[in-house]
Amino acid sequence: MDKKAIFDSVSNMEEQIGELYQQLGDLKTNLGEMLEENNRLNLENEHLRRRLSLTDEGTLEPVAEEEAVHGVMAPNRKEAMQQMIELGEGYDNLVQLYKEGFHVCNVHFGSPRGNDEDCLFCLSLLNKK
């Protein structure tokens, strides 16, 4: 092979590597978005399962039409929600999410933490309890 052919071959490889790097970056972005969405859906699913179990137990009334349409809670529902909040379930959920490698701070909420590095914002939030 002459020098020009070798140079062209190396240039071609460089372009291919650049394209692969771009594809890898796109895949990484898509994966991050999918992880965030999966996390959000898991939380929503868990919340709905708890709500269903509370409804089945009679602790929580089914959602009234007014609440569904206008976002206004019935008085009994407010009391039940207040009891759940007082139990610290939300805090426990945040701790679990943080242990699973996700941000719980308002700056990066739901996004994966890189290499399980600690986030000062998350830690300050979790230590407020």
UniProtKB/Swiss-Prot annotation:
InterPro entries this protein is in?
YabA
Q: Which UniProt keywords apply?
A: Cytoplasm, DNA replication, DNA replication inhibitor, Metal-binding, Zinc
Tell me the GO BP annotations in alphabetical order: DNA replication
Q: Which cofactors does this protein require?
A: Zn(2+)
* GO CC list: nucleoid
Q: Does the keyword Transcription apply?
A: no
Q: How does it assemble?
A: Homotetramer. Interacts with both DnaA and DnaN, acting as a bridge between these two proteins.
Q: What is this protein called?
A: Replication initiation control protein YabA
Give the organism, scientific name. Answer: Listeria welshimeri serovar 6b (strain ATCC 35897 / DSM 20650 / CCUG 15529 / CIP 8149 / NCTC 11857 / SLCC 5334 / V8)
Gene for this chain: yabA
